[in-house]
Regions:
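Short, C-terminally biased terminal segments at protein or domain edges
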Residues: 1-49, 56-126
Length: 126
């Protein structure tokens, strides 16, 4: 039986949540709202993929959730860029840059996955 964990982009984004959490823990308490927004956006990417997967009987509904996942990935990138610009003493710019690169890859993978879903191509390797 096909499971959401069979989807490569889903597995890839789950791996990024730990370094995202580590980075968020370095954000000063005075910017706790930014920390919460970063974590909420990052965590919503796999959640939206999973929710869409559960509704995959309707291709339109599935695509809608995947498109929301791209939006959340892009929102995560924006929060990471804001963190870079804030120059928090404990946060390394290189760490932000690496996560930005990885979430950019996630957004691209999701876009390819949406194209595959639209064409009914087997999707486990995307």
């Amino acid at each position: 039986m096909y499971d959401v964990q069979d989807i490569k982009v889903y597995r890839n984004v789950l791996v990024l949540l730990e370094p995202l959490q580590r980075l968020a823990s370095l954000i000063p308490r005075s910017d706790s709202r930014l920390k919460i927004q970063l974590l909420n956006a990052g965590r919503s990417v796999p959640a939206q993929i999973a929710e869409g997967f559960a509704k995959r009987r309707s291709q339109k509904e599935y695509r809608r959730f995947l498109e929301m996942a791209i939006g959340s990935s892009d929102e995560t990138i924006t929060h990471l860029r804001i963190i870079q610009l804030a120059h928090f003493p404990q946060v390394k710019i290189e760490t932000c840059a690496a996560l930005i690169k990885q979430f950019t890859i996630i957004s691209k993978q999701l876009n390819k996955y949406i194209q595959a879903v639209s064409k009914n191509i087997p999707r486990s390797d995307i």
